[in-house]
């Protein structure tokens, strides 16, 4: 009898632990450690379980529009990597708070309000994906490692479950956005949602379009365009560039080992650019432990996100992850989409709007390569190359294509929106409102 009682108690305790870490938990966060006073916006955090057994627990941050959440667009924002936490988007790129940049003294870093949050005109879901990123985790060992196409399916499942629990947003115009490596996943996700709306999944998601910043599209092409970009930005000489064009014939990545002359020239190019910060070429290449380094904010974020009180406030499941890492590049991952261009083509044919933007000082994914794959779609122009303005100042350049695709540069911008927050916000606000840039 005693043994039966003990067994029953242990079973109940196990069940309680399971339920406490079970899927589809959501909590309202009214304050955050490091931020002075109550949050001036509505924040919800939680997990949505995906997979056959809901073994994958995807963590999200949801911030309601500060204007009119009942009618404003709903945006899903993904960070790149793969393996970079969506906290990158929330704290640096387009969210309503940021880490205060000050020398770390052993106490919790502070958070401050931002001026140009995209939540002024849209509600945003920031999602940690793939599993193993940020606060997302798996309750069991995965049978298959994450992949580009697999993530499109998982995120689609996440969205249906999230909207099922937030039905008040099911009729809002829905958009997907992200930058960097998300250029491989988001076009496939848009296609997955579009197909699901017709084939399997009710109610349909009110998908209207997508926005991508400095998006990866095809790895070899993206890298090959770094050479003409470096030449245009005076990082390599005319002579070296002309020699590379002639001998390498435009192929600078995965060079044929028999082409020793090309390999030598590529080596010369690398000597000229190895100390360049490719994310924003006008900033120093530096280590994040130096307070003078731009990336110091990432170190402060690591201290903040690993604090027990912060994780408690965010309602992170205790013990679900080890150390929080902003970008975990060691996630086992299958890069099974070699080019996202066909997905862009299909999404345009299906009538979805898209804005592709490039910081013109990004060398990770140079705007030259982005323009090249857009040209390959052979869309007719409806508004040719022109400056877009903020007040009387040029903020960048833009052109608009048929099939609802627009391209824009951000003058002086880098790999992500964080480097030019005002310009990025105004660009987004105009596009999401249906206005010309």
Curated annotation (Swiss-Prot):
Disulfide bonds join 84-327, 248-262, 286-293. It is found in: Secreted. Glycans are attached at residues 105, 346, 378. Its EC number is 3.4.16.-. GO terms for molecular function: serine-type carboxypeptidase activity. Coiled coil: none annotated. Pfam families: Peptidase_S10. Keywords: Carboxypeptidase, Disulfide bond, Glycoprotein, Hydrolase, Protease, Secreted, Signal. GO terms for biological process: proteolysis. Residues 1-25 form the signal peptide. One of its GO terms (cellular component) is extracellular region. Ubiquitous. The active site is at 180, 362, 415. Probable carboxypeptidase. Belongs to the peptidase S10 family. This is Serine carboxypeptidase-like 7. It comes from Arabidopsis thaliana (Mouse-ear cress).
């Amino acid at each position: 009898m005693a043994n039966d009682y003990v067994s029953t108690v242990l079973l109940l305790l196990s069940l309680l632990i399971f339920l406490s870490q079970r899927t589809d938990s959501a909590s309202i966060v009214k304050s955050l450690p490091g931020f002075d006073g109550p949050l001036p916006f509505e924040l919800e955090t939680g997990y949505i379980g995906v997979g056959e057994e809901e073994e994958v627990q995807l963590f999200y941050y949801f911030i309601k529009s500060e204007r009119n959440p009942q009618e404003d667009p709903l945006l899903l924002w993904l960070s790149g990597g793969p393996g970079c936490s969506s906290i990158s988007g929330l704290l640096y790129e387009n969210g309503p708070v940021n880490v205060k940049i000050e020398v770390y003294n052993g106490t919790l870093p502070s958070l401050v309000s931002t001026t140009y949050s995209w939540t002024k005109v849209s509600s945003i879901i920031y999602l940690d994906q793939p599993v193993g990123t940020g606060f997302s985790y798996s309750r069991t060992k995965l049978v298959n490692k994450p992949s580009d196409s697999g993530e499109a399916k998982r995120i689609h499942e996440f969205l249906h479950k999230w909207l099922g629990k937030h039905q008040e947003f099911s009729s809002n115009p829905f958009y997907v956005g992200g930058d960097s490596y998300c250029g491989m996943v988001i076009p496939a996700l848009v296609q997955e949602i579009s197909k699901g709306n017709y084939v399997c999944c009710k109610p349909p998601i009110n998908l209207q379009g997508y926005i991508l910043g400095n998006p990866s599209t095809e790895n070899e092409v993206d890298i090959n365009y770094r050479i003409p970009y470096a030449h245009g930005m005076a990082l390599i000489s005319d002579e070296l560039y002309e020699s590379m064009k002639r001998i390498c014939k435009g192929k600078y990545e995965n060079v044929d080992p028999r082409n020793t002359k090309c390999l030598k020239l590529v080596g010369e190019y690398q000597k000229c650019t190895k100390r360049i910060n490719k994310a924003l070429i006008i900033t120093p290449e530096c280590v994040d432990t130096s307070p003078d380094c731009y990336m110091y904010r990432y170190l402060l974020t690591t201290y903040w996100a690993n604090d027990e009180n912060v994780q408690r406030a965010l309602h992170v499941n205790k013990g679900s992850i080890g150390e929080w890492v902003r970008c975990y590049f060691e996630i086992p991952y299958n890069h099974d989409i070699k080019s996202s261009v066909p997905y862009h083509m299909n999404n345009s044919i299906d009538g979805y709007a898209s804005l592709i933007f490039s910081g013109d000082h990004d060398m990770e994914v140079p705007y030259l390569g982005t323009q090249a794959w857009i040209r390959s779609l052979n869309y007719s122009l409806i508004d040719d190359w022109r400056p877009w303005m903020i007040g009387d100042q040029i903020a960048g350049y833009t052109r608009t294509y048929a099939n609802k695709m627009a391209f824009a540069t951000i003058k002086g911008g880098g790999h992500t929106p964080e480097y030019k927050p005002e310009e990025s916000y105004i660009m987004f606000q105009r596009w999401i409102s249906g206005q010309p840039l």
